[in-house]
Every structure is written in structure tokens, then in C-alpha cells.
Amino acid sequence: MLRATTSAVPRALSWPAAPGNGSEREPLDDRDPLLARVELALLSTVFVAVALSNGLVLGALVRRGRRGRWAPMHVFIGHLCLADLAVALFQVLPQLAWDATYRFRGPDALCRAVKYLQMVGMYASSYMILAMTLDRHRAICRPMLAYRHGGGARWNRPVLVAWAFSLLLSLPQLFIFAQRDVGDGSGVLDCWASFAEPWGLRAYVTWIALMVFVAPALGIAACQVLIFREIHTSLVPGPAERAGGHRGGRRAGSPREGARVSAAMAKTARMTLVIVAVYVLCWAPFFLVQLWSVWDPKAPREGPPFVLLMLLASLNSCTNPWIYASFSSSISSELRSLLCCPRRRTPPSLRPQEESCATASSFSARDTSS
């Protein structure tokens, strides 16, 4: 049986207690009171940070959408905010209530629903970043293909695929978790998971680490390498370009247009690099601790550093909105308006062209119209 303790967030990634042996089970409540208060304070801070950050950015996007059609970049950012808000509402908030009461207070159906939605938020947040990066790669490396698909709708294929995979990959939670007795005949119930085989826990936690963290990180990093290579190739003219102003059969645009496209591509590369670095830094501690806890029987599972690191599954959801807002002048200006910080309007001709670099459709539209 997979033991659900206050030291695992989400509790889908906890470690097992010895099944069928009440003497090996922990007491009904053996928490360190000080550590429990620190957990509650940390979870409360994370919840406020995730909800406020993503709520502000989503509000800025809604304000901008009322004045016209969303740019393709805004579609991805909007859905990433929704995914991160799902993390706050369905992962952090239930975990906060759970830690406050120590045991899960609710019927079996609610237990299964909470466990399912906790994983949906984790998957959706990771896969939306991957979908956005894949779209940026297509914009820069395959602009004609991107142009044929178009963009700007509130839903597009990468967004739908990201949500669909998140909903499907979270389904095992409904069958693994249930309200179960925490001891032999004690009558106390908690939302625990059980596996038919002793190796089931290790396999499941490793699978989640691969699908939520490792696979998306490798996909994002691979796109980053290809984007950097394309930018380097476009900025370093070959012999044919120097002789006739063409490369790869494409007609060269004006020097001003070429400089703007190059700057937009470079900005995309910088943003993607920041995303990869922050993504790894935020997720790595959590999953390293989770894997350590299930693969090493002697892991210090109850130590304060171990416990607190397991609370940081939602850290990436705090940083996502600010990364994209800092690289998007349009979102930044809307945020200033929301926060009552007026700024002198910049002429359209002088505004940064971040939307053209960040998504496939808008980048390719400019590229093909030159």
C-alpha cells in the first residue's frame, strides 16, 4: 500500500507502508508541530503566489482580447495560466486543507477526484510549456508549414493535444487511490494508494517523473538546440547569400526587416533558454527527492529538508507567468494598466515584435509577406 503522508505533495507520489502489519505503521498523528506549521505556511505562500501571478496575467490577456483577436502567442500563455491555476486550485489548495487536518476528510469519490485533478494540473502545466516550445520551433525552423496551419484561435491543435494527454495520463489516479483504513481495525481512513506488486510504487513514481519532468524537459531542450542552430544559420550568411542575397532559395527581405526578424528570433531563443533553466531548477529538487524516497529504503523521509522539498511541486507554476510577461511587451503593458501604473504609449512602429517570434503563425506570416 502506498502511504499518504503530509510530506508528499502531491500525495500521488508518496512511499509505501508495510501492508497488513499494524505494528509497522506510524501512529495516527506523529507530526512535528513546528514542521507542520512550516508546511502550512509554505503551502499558503505557494497558493497565493500561483493564484495571484497567473490570475493577473490571465486578466491582462482578457483585457487585451476584448480589444481584438488574441495573438497566437497569447493563446498558449492563456492556456498555460489556466493549467497553472488548476495546479493552485486542485493541487495546492486541497493539499493545504489536507495538511491542516492531517487525514483526508471526505468520501471516497472526493478522494479519487482530488488525486486525479492533482495530476491533471501537473501534466497540463508541463505539457503546455512543451506545446508552446514546439510551436516556436515550428515557427522558426518550418515557417511555411506553420503558415499553412494559421493561428490566433482560442484553441488550437497543440493546446488540445496538451490538455488531452493531461486528462488521459492522469486516469490511473482514479484506480490507485481510495479511502482506506490506515491501521488494522483502527477505523481511521485516509486517501491512500495500493499496488498489487511490491515494485508497483517504484514503477509508478518513476513513470510520473519521466512523463511530467524528464520527457518534457528533453523535448524543450531539443527544440532549444534546433532553434539556436536555425538562428545561427540565419545570422551567419553563407557564400550564396553573400554573392546573390539568397539562402536556401528564399528571397532576402530589406535590411530593416531582416534585422527585425533576427532580433525577434534571438528574443525567442533567450526566452526559451530561460524557460528550460527555470523548468529544470523548479522541478528537479521535487522529483529527485521523490525518486530517492522510493528507491532508497534508508532515505531520510521525515527530515525537515526532505519534507519541505516535497512541497515544491508547484514552484514552476509561480514562475511561468512572469517569464512570459517579461518577454512580452503587450502583456507587460496590460499588467501595468491592471496595477494602475500608466506608461507613456509607444508608437506601434517602435514596439517590440515579440508576437512574431513567439508563435508559428504570426512569425511565418511576416516571413512570407516580405
Curated annotation (Swiss-Prot):
GO biological process, alphabetically ordered: cellular response to hormone stimulus; G protein-coupled receptor signaling pathway; positive regulation of gene expression; positive regulation of vasoconstriction; regulation of systemic arterial blood pressure by vasopressin
UniProtKB keywords: Cell membrane, G-protein coupled receptor, Glycoprotein, Lipoprotein, Membrane, Palmitate, Receptor, Transducer, Transmembrane, Transmembrane helix
PROSITE patterns listed in its UniProt record: G_PROTEIN_RECEP_F1_1, G_PROTEIN_RECEP_F1_2
Disordered as annotated region, ranges: 1-28, 347-370
Residue stretches of biased makeup (Polar residues): 356-370
Similarity remark: Belongs to the G-protein coupled receptor 1 family. Vasopressin/oxytocin receptor subfamily.
Protein name, as recorded: Vasopressin V2 receptor
Organism: Sus scrofa (Pig)
